[in-house]
């Protein structure tokens, strides 16, 4: 059986593990996109450390959870958004203004919607976390 969206599966697994109070989540299969999303989440203080573990197949990410995530998930379809339009999607995916973040894939790499707005670049919405 193949996964249709490994990123959505990984974020759903993180959200479920946070919900039941686990301290560690193991995400597989691992990919560069999942690693970059985890890095943004770590930089913003939603997760602790994470590490890549080679298992001879697709690899595994071990993520230390710190109890900061209420909900996280992938945005589907991946909307193309101009930096002036982030507020519309904040209202759709986040519970309140200034609470949580949208992760955006831009030509300058993955970043939060606030960083993209400050840099003046748009991109595709990848996920949300709050």
From Swiss-Prot:
Keyword terms, alphabetized: Ribonucleoprotein, Ribosomal protein, RNA-binding, rRNA-binding
One Pfam match: Ribosomal_S8
Keyword Oxidoreductase appears in the UniProt entry: no
GO cellular component terms attached to this protein's record: ribonucleoprotein complex; ribosome
UniProt GO BP: translation
Molecular function, one GO term: rRNA binding
Keyword Membrane among record annotations: no
SUPFAM superfamilies (UniProt xref): Ribosomal protein S8
Source taxon at top rank: Archaea
Transmembrane segments: none
Assembly and interaction partners: Part of the 30S ribosomal subunit.
Function: One of the primary rRNA binding proteins, it binds directly to 16S rRNA central domain where it helps coordinate assembly of the platform of the 30S subunit.
Family: Belongs to the universal ribosomal protein uS8 family.
Protein name listed in UniProt: Small ribosomal subunit protein uS8
Native source species: Methanococcus vannielii (strain ATCC 35089 / DSM 1224 / JCM 13029 / OCM 148 / SB)
Gene name of the record: rps8
């Amino acid at each position: 059986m193949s996964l249709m969206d490994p990123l959505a599966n990984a974020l759903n697994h993180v959200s479920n593990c946070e919900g039941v109070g686990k301290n560690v989540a193991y995400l597989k299969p691992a990919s560069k996109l999942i690693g970059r999303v985890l890095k943004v989440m770590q930089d913003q203080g939603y997760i602790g450390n994470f590490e890549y573990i080679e298992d001879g197949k697709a690899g595994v990410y071990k993520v230390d959870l710190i109890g900061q995530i209420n909900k996280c998930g992938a945005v589907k379809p991946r909307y193309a958004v101009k930096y002036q339009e982030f507020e519309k999607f904040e209202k759709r995916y986040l519970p309140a203004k200034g609470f949580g973040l949208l992760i955006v894939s831009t030509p300058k790499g993955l970043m939060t919607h606030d960083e993209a707005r400050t840099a003046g670049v748009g991109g595709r919405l990848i996920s949300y976390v709050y």
